[in-house]
Amino acid sequence: MNCLQNLPRCSVSPLLGFGCIQRDHSSSSSSLKMLISPPIKANDPKSRLVLHAVSESKSSSEMSGVAKDEEKSDEYSQDMTQAMGAVLTYRHELGMNYNFIRPDLIVGSCLQTPEDVDKLRKIGVKTIFCLQQDPDLEYFGVDISSIQAYAKKYSDIQHIRCEIRDFDAFDLRMRLPAVVGTLYKAVKRNGGVTYVHCTAGMGRAPAVALTYMFWVQGYKLMEAHKLLMSKRSCFPKLDAIRNATIDILTGLKRKTVTLTLKDKGFSRVEISGLDIGWGQRIPLTLDKGTGFWILKRELPEGQFEYKYIIDGEWTHNEAEPFIGPNKDGHTNNYAKVVDDPTSVDGTTRERLSSEDPELLEEERSKLIQFLETCSEAEV
């Protein structure tokens, strides 16, 4: 069985033989206190993580660096809140933070120094599963190569990178099958505690952990979500998990969708959203014969929101289906891609698209078979 989505964006640091020398490094000089807001209801979109630190006195140059990190954290938190649709705050300058979701599964923020590897080894972590892309690391100045090199010195821990684009629910959907396949095999191989992280540990990492719990560990989706939210304030994209589940069980079907906008003397028309996320744009082509700007796009099954950008101005097209305004005041167009709803696959998709889908025994077996046969060579 082939993976739905090949995974070239994955790197693995292999475990060494048990005869290698292990080194102990002292912990960071900062004394960190982390306060997390009380657990919230699973359906509360206004999840918030609050961190406080008490550090020893620092030099002026160190304080300058902290100020820059604080500014970057503010910007990142604003972007995250806007993109995720939930009030989320990440303070990179306070160091790595995490929560045990289960005794064998941790969701947390990114490692920042090689010394963080030692901190995780001390709590029994055997697999560090990183979902960050290079731009994520560069933004906060994290040297991933030094962290990977340090982890390779030890026989009892493995560092794995499987990238997912930040703030992109479609990329999450498309990457989940191969990423969770890699995670599944790593857990079987290494045992112990697994540390899943992205940048803040509030979007991609909880989504991957939640999917693993749903597909492999026998949880219903909302049962796993409730447990996750009781341990860590975060905002995983549930629709991406539902769609990735359906993609494996019914096959990844695509259909061509045509979007059109009547020309009114525009110079440039673009679309954002759809399957590319809100941070990217696709230009439309003007058909002078019909007087319409046109975009043809192959999309998998599901509902995709989008917006037009006409000569730099964001708007929606009232001649196409639209929804809103949403809680942020935005009105978006949407394209709904469906196969035959009366078919067996159509019935399965409808059932698993519900608020709290429950996998049948044979469906979970099929998912695990997929994860087992999605070979390392493909990822």
UniProtKB/Swiss-Prot annotation:
It is found in: Plastid, Chloroplast. InterPro entries: AMPK1_CBM (IPR032640), DSP_laforin-like (IPR045204), Dual-sp_phosphatase_cat-dom (IPR000340), Ig-like_fold (IPR013783), Ig_E-set (IPR014756), Prot-tyrosine_phosphatase-like (IPR029021), Starch-Glucan_Phosphatase (IPR052832), Tyr_Pase_dom (IPR000387). Residues 259-335 are annotated as: Polysaccharide binding. Changing residue 330 to A: Decreases glucan phosphatase activity. One of its GO terms (biological process) is starch metabolic process. Changing residue 203 to D: Nearly abolishes glucan phosphatase activity. Disruption phenotype: Reduced plant size, slightly delayed flowering, leaves with large round starch granules and starch in excess. Changing residue 278 to A: Nearly abolishes glucan phosphatase activity. Strongly reduces starch binding efficiency. Keywords: Carbohydrate metabolism, Chloroplast, Hydrolase, Plastid, Protein phosphatase, Transit peptide. Changing residue 90 to A: Reduces starch binding and glucan phosphatase activity. This is Phosphoglucan phosphatase DSP4, chloroplastic. It comes from Arabidopsis thaliana.
